[in-house]
Amino acid sequence: MEHIMNPFMSPAYLLGHGPHSHQHVHSHLPSHPQPNAASPASSPGGSSGSGSGSAAGSGTGSGSSLKPRRWGSPPINLAGQFINPATGKKRVQCSICFKTFCDKGALKIHFSAVHLREMHKCTVEGCNMVFSSRRSRNRHSANPNPKLHSPHIRRKISPHDGRTAQQFPVFSPGTAAAAAAVAGRLPVAFPGLLPPPPPHHGHHPYVMFGGQAGLHGLGLLSTGCQDPDSGSVDNEQDADPEDDNDFVYVDMQANSSSPAASSEDQEEHERDNEQDEEMHCSLSLASSSSIAADEERAADQPLDFSLHKRRKSEQDREQEQEQEQEREREAEKEQEQDVESDKEHEPEQEHELEREKRSPSDAFSMDQLLGKRKRHDSTASSSACSTAAASSASSSSASASANPPQTSIKMDLDPDSDSAYMTSRRQMLPLPVLDLEEHHHLRLLQTQMFAAAAAAAATSQAPPTAFLPAGSPVDLAKDSPPMWSLLSEMYRSMLLKTQHQQYNHHHQLQQQHQQEQHHHLTLSHHHQEQHHHLGHHHMGHHHHHHHQHHQQQPQQQSPAATNAPISV
């Protein structure tokens, strides 16, 4: 095997090799530090005389006729030779980047080109590409294509072009660990052999891709951090074309411990300009990495557009319901505080409030909630009951002052409570602002109605609890209509109502509130007036909302033709 004398080979490599006329066997030890070895390579023939006996690990006798059976010494065989079980072919593996080659010549070329490089940086400003030869660097710098000089936009390597990207070591884990330990000690013994650590290199893929972003997009690395010795997968030209048969290709470029990884395959690809059709931006991979992470989290669901939409609408609805629940609890606490202030005007009222906040006994119970749900559904389903419902609503608002906590338990599964919240906010606003708020609310309702219809189309047989939070112990009544149909009914009825009706209604209700509040404020102390205002606003808007809803029942039942295609 003739020597390839290269001006870029390191002095340590060239030390023992003069221009010999005969061929001889090298036991080349790239990553095995030996304290007494003058050079990492020596010949068994002893012609160079610079190596120690232990370095000549392959004693093959006549070096001129035989190829060496292995490089390196037996304990840590760093140029690892292994036999592919599928094809029976012998291959050698680079100990640093774990790529495999068909023979040692290819490995030696790879090693001197990739791991012994002298760096030539591109002269275009903003480009961090580094090359092992000036010729490659000059040709790269002369190319005006901006895609070559921007570090984030990479080219796709065809997985069938005969280059292996062997990602992980083929030896046993123990050997790999020992090799890693030796590689960690290397820079002390041979300064030129290993590249400096990644964070100092602007061109290193770790820096270029901002951590693991590219690999997340490929789905190949989880959130753990990158192995320092997990190998560079720069795709070399000198890996032989038989590699197609032997290995599964892992086509990725973002994981590398040699700083040459990115530059090397850039350089390779400049050489074959006819493959320019294959260019693509792996920036899109990096940018879609968050989406890919979400997909992995919900990987049990097939990637279907309608299912995605349904999942999103479920999450949105769960969040809405949780917010409604919190709102209900706050309103309730304030009303109960009002009741206590009516009953007892002693100074220990603050202790009472604290105790009540700590253990809200009747603040929120599922049974009352469900009873309310069933009653609400039964009145909503028949239009015949609507007059009775309206009268009962007015009577309950009359008895509001008698029993505040009971009436304040408005069920949080009732889909209207966010609109109730909006109307309550509207009552507290001055009247000119009302129009803008109203428009916003109607637009919001419209979009929610569309989302509900889409979700219904996606899950035509979904159980009525499809949109409830996952852990909620709610068992709805068997015959209750599904949640989305209630939603769409309610939204449509709210859209049918005109602005004028609401304006008049608010006027009447505000006068009514003011009378009630005046009556109640005479009972309470002066320092509790603010609490009182708030509580009665809430109470008033709850009853107003029930009243509103029952008033709209005949309107809801009328458009039966539009109702037909939506109903499950």
Swiss-Prot record:
Biased composition (Basic and acidic residues): 313-360
First and last residues of each zinc finger (C2H2-type): 92-115, 120-145
Ranges of compositional bias, category Acidic residues: 235-246
Family annotation (Gene3D superfamilies): Classic Zinc Finger (3.30.160.60)
Major localization listed first in the record, in broad terms: nucleus
Tissue/organ expression: Expressed at low levels in the adult head and very low, but detectable, levels in the body.
Biased composition (Basic residues): 19-29, 520-550
Compositional bias of kind Gly residues: 46-62
Molecular function via GO: DNA binding; RNA polymerase II transcription regulatory region sequence-specific DNA binding; zinc ion binding
Polar residues biased stretches: 253-263, 558-568
InterPro entries: Disconnected-like (IPR040436), Znf_C2H2_type (IPR013087)
Keywords: Developmental protein, DNA-binding, Metal-binding, Nucleus, Repeat, Sensory transduction, Vision, Zinc, Zinc-finger
Compartments in which it is found: Nucleus
Region annotated Disordered, chain positions: 16-77, 134-157, 220-364, 391-419, 501-568
Recorded GO CC terms: nucleus
Keyword Ion transport on entry: no
PROSITE patterns: ZINC_FINGER_C2H2_1 (PS00028), ZINC_FINGER_C2H2_2 (PS50157)
Bias type Low complexity, positions: 30-45, 282-292, 391-402
GO BP terms: antennal development; brain development; circadian rhythm; eclosion rhythm; leg disc proximal/distal pattern formation; locomotor rhythm; photoreceptor cell maintenance; positive regulation of DNA-templated transcription
Role this protein plays: Required for the establishment of stable connections between the larval optic nerves, the Bolwig's nerves, and their target cells in the brain during embryonic development.
Name this protein carries in UniProt: Protein disconnected
Gene label: disco
